[in-house]
Amino acid sequence: PPRSTLDRSSAASDVYKRQSEVKRLIADPRSWHFVRSFCDQWLKVYRHHEMQVDVTEHPSFTRFVKNDLAEETYHFTRHVMQNNMSIFTLIDSDFVMINQNLAEFYGIPGVQGTDFQVIPVSPEMKRGGLITQGSFLSGHSDGNQGHPIKRAVWLMERILGESPPPPPPNVPDLDPKDPVNQQLSIAQQLAIHRDSVSCRNCHKKLDPYGLVFEEYNGAGLLNPPTTSAQDTKVTLPTGGIVNGVAEMKDYIVQSRSREFRTSLVKHLLTYALGRDMSFADEKDIKNIVETLSAKGDRFQTLVETLVTSPLFLR
């Protein structure tokens, strides 16, 4: 949406006017441009668009489903923003934003129509929040099965704000066509990788954040219940143990809340300023993070605090 009024308010250094303008801009239908472009940059939704899911293996993954999976992410994020929900709703929510097409894809009953709508979900459905959405899960797969390393890197970079270690040179990817690998689960294959001295340190940090997603296949659907529960039970680099995505959500919200809060602030600043954050920005970032936390972690508070910060006004 146009920033002219916001810019004039900024020039006047009028905090109240800027905050009011934020509310107006968020309510404006043209805020869709912000939501889509920010989600594309922050969450790397483009990877979902680029991924060629094997439709012979996943016949329900039609081109209409593929399009709606990206729309789900946009609608969900916009709903959280416009309703001024907690930023932690982005991690875990008791609802999804879907239409009939996606409801049939996910296996969620009772949804009709093409419009995206708020649909309550129970824990047994294993949905809710960004990290169980098909756009992320399919976009970070190999088109058939889930890809734990891609998913781990995304979670560390986009959600926790960590920089994963780069792989050592000349280390081949896991080959799904290898007869030996075909007899092993992904968790077992990665365990073999960890036995290699050159791979051990990287995989010890990465694997736990990816293996929790082994409940979901390359299309973003739940794997059959026959999938070993042990594949999703992991020991985190911090020493804690989580089993599956539900416990990973709890871990992020309860134990890594500051990391997620800081990561989201940095990603939004990067988008708003059109540049990466640097060491010189750390003091201002810390102030935004502390203000956001003190005011209840509401999404609109995040935007208001950002646009009244020295970083934005310089």
How should these model regions be labeled?
Residues 10-13, 24-29, 41-45, 76-83, ...:
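Structured segments of extracytoplasmic/periplasmic soluble domains
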Residues 1-12, 16:
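Single conserved hydrophobic/aromatic residue that forms the stacking wall/gate
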Residues 35, 55-56, 260, 264, ...:
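Short, surface-exposed glycine/acidic/tryptophan-bearing loops
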